A protein has these predicted regions:
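Membrane helical hairpin/interfacial module
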Residues: 1-37
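Inter-helical loop and helix-membrane interface segments of multi-pass membrane transporters/permeases
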Residues: 19-26, 51, 79-110, 166-183, ...
């Protein structure tokens, strides 16, 4: 579970969890965690800190921390569906192996694996409730540390690729190659290329949504208390969080934190994560979708309870400072 709490499933967490898990059931629960926590920590937060304007980072912090609270619920829902349905999965990391292992996930296993997540989420909730300003500052510092660490790792990997320096000096190198090789045809550089290609469609999609779907989205959002812009943001984020991040600057503070909280659990729902699941574990598509959707809905509830009021106060303070 720890592996995919910090590393996204489709960025190496799936393979790492496979190597570390004692049972196939724990592996699959870790997979569910990685779809939400791992994707947020290793991808969404560092990328958002680069894409968003500085004044929007506090809304990112409030939204993400609120969304993290819903992750145990999403993992529980997905695991409960698995516990009831007993799907047959591929017991190795493969896109073409036969599904031969029938999962026998017990309620006791679910409870034990969720304990660390629940402890983290309770601590986050208490911090957001009683010390929101300190939590925002701490989150931004954490994001900068993550960004710096990723840059250092990138430099080390590039140096190793072109010179082999670390292998010569230390006898081995702890990180995977950055470019595809005979062992893996989809390394980090290929992942970056895939992200770039996704952006080619994501930004036009956001433009078309805002231009042609504003009225129907306003009606749909109004029924559940959301603005048309917030509804468009949720829809964009469900495909890819990059599409959502590109439209954050157009949103009100309230909508920003709602969309960011939802994205913690539901980003990539109908894009990357659906595709990854269909390729590696097609029998788990339904649990993944239900778990992420349940968590996304709960994230919206949590952000209303814990962060919307604070976001509106921060927005009012920003406006007052600009007009002063």
């Amino acid at each position: 579970m720890a592996a995919t709490t910090f590393i996204a499933v489709d960025m190496g967490g799936y393979q790492l969890a496979d190597a570390l898990a004692q049972t196939r059931e724990s592996w699959i629960m870790a997979m569910m965690t990685g779809y939400m926590a791992g994707a947020t920590i290793v991808f969404t937060v560092p990328v958002a800190l680069k894409m968003l304007e500085k004044r929007d980072r506090k809304y990112l912090a409030l939204g993400v921390m609120s969304g993290l609270l819903a992750i145990p619920i999403g993992v529980f829902v997905a695991s409960a569906v698995i516990a009831v349905s007993h799907p047959v999965i591929r017991e190795v990391v493969s896109t073409n192996a036969d599904a031969t292992y029938q999962l026998a996930l017990t309620w006791a296993q679910i409870g034990v694996n969720l304990v660390p997540l629940i402890i983290i989420c309770v601590a986050l909730a208490l911090g957001l409730k009683f010390k929101p300003d300190a939590m925002i500052k701490g989150f931004i510092v954490f994001g900068r540390v993550m960004e710096g660490a990723l840059k250092i790792v990138f430099v080390l990997v590039v140096v190793e690729y072109f010179t082999g320096l670390f292998t010569m000096v230390f006898g081995s190198f702890g990180f995977d190659p950055i470019i595809a090789d005979e062992d893996d045809m989809f390394r980090a550089l290929e992942t970056a290329g895939a992200i770039g290609m996704m952006l080619c469609g994501a930004f036009p999609m956001v433009y078309l949504i805002r231009k042609y779907l504003a009225k129907p989205l306003a009606k749909i959002g109004g029924a559940v208390g959301l603005s048309s812009d917030a509804t468009a943001g949720l829809l964009a984020g469900s495909a890819n969080v990059l599409a959502l991040l590109s439209m954050v600057k157009y949103l009100k503070a309230r909508d920003k934190v709602i969309c960011m909280a939802f994205a913690v659990c539901c980003a990539f729902l109908f894009g990357d994560h659906l595709s990854f699941t269909a390729n590696f574990q097609p029998s788990l598509i339904v649990p993944v979708l239900l778990g992420k959707l349940a968590a996304g809905i709960c994230a919206i509830v949590f952000v209303h309870l814990l962060a919307v009021k604070k976001a509106e106060e921060l927005e009012a303070a920003d406006l007052a400072a600009e007009t002063a």
